[in-house]
């Protein structure tokens, strides 16, 4: 039976001694059920286990597949064991973190080099004071439409294309009910009858 990877939902950690660096990286060992043992947390794991911090394995030379000394105390970690999680991915899927060095060489600095972010904050360039405020984001028709919308929301009368001035409220003809009609809010295109507009 093939051992399950630590990120597999069916993976269960076995109680017992923790494995150390060895030739077989596919053992899937972890400190807890499905928690990744990130190299930056190794000192914490060592302290929590009551054994105290052990000196870091020497970073000189390359790991040649032989088992580390029994007192090294580092868990088995492969490149596949180092990943980032994404809450938008389906459960159990991970984003692999490609290491710049083999995991064994990463122990010396206890730092990982994560990939560059997909989205990063970028400050928009500030307009130069000599040019004034920039309106390059909107085209001419967009500016006209936006100006019209702002005027409508503030209740200002719309400029008409003809040369007719604003409506004169004093010269409105009296309504059939005897009171002066208001040109604001009334639809002049509909015929007014005494049945529908009188109180």
From Swiss-Prot:
A single BP term in Gene Ontology: regulation of DNA-templated transcription
Disordered: annotated segments: 151-199
Disulfide bonds: none
Bias (Polar residues) ranges: 151-163, 184-199
Matching Pfam families: SAP25 (PF15476)
Keyword field contains Cytoplasm: yes
Localization per record: Nucleus; Cytoplasm
UniProtKB keywords: Cytoplasm, Nucleus, Repressor, Transcription, Transcription regulation
A cellular-component GO term for this protein: nucleus
InterPro entries xref list: SAP25
Keyword Cell inner membrane set for record: no
Assembly and interaction partners: May be a component of the mSIN3A corepressor complex. Interacts with SIN3A. Interacts with HDAC2.
PANTHER family: HISTONE DEACETYLASE COMPLEX SUBUNIT SAP25
Record function comment: Involved in the transcriptional repression mediated by the mSIN3A but not the N-CoR corepressor complex.
Record-given protein name: Histone deacetylase complex subunit SAP25
Primary gene name: SAP25
């Amino acid at each position: 039976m093939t051992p399950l990877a630590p990120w597999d939902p069916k993976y269960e950690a076995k109680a017992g001694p923790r494995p150390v660096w060895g030739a077989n990286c596919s053992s899937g060992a972890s400190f807890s059920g499905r928690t990744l043992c990130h190299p930056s947390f190794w000192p914490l794991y060592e302290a929590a286990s009551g054994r105290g911090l052990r000196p870091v394995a020497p970073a000189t030379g390359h790991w040649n597949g032989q088992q580390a000394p029994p007192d090294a105390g580092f868990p088995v970690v492969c490149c596949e064991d180092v990943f980032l999680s994404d809450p938008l991915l389906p459960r159990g899927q991970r984003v692999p973190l490609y290491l710049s060095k083999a995991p064994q060489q990463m122990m010396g600095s206890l730092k990982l080099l994560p990939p560059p972010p997909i989205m990063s904050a970028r400050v928009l360039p500030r307009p130069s004071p000599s040019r004034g405020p920039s309106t390059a984001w909107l085209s001419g028709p967009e500016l006209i439409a936006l100006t019209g919308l702002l005027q409508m929301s503030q209740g200002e009368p719309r400029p008409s294309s003809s040369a007719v001035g604003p409506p004169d409220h004093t010269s409105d003809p009296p309504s059939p009910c005897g009171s002066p009609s208001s040109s604001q809010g009334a639809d002049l295109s509909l015929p007014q009858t005494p049945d529908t507009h009188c109180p």
